[in-house]
Amino acid sequence: MKYNIGDSISINNTDWIISEHRMGRGREWLYTLSHEETDGSYTTMSLNERAMDGLALTGGFIGSSDN
């Protein structure tokens, strides 16, 4: 696992938070990202580690809530 719960990611000018990570089929990490809408509802999406690596290469990561 490379990415931590609470890390922020910007995708298409929208901030997403890593809310969950789990081991998928085989040995692949899967990450659940969540975005809170203004009405309090949440939108979620799941990405595998390869997709997350692509976001890191394009500068999508904002930072960690641990800092």
Enumerate the language-model features and the residues they cover.
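Intrinsically disordered, low-complexity, charged/polar segments
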Residues: 39-67
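Short coil-to-beta transition motif at edge beta-strands of beta-rich domains
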Residues: 1-11
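Basic/aromatic-rich interaction segments and small domains that mediate binding to polyanionic partners
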Residues: 12-49
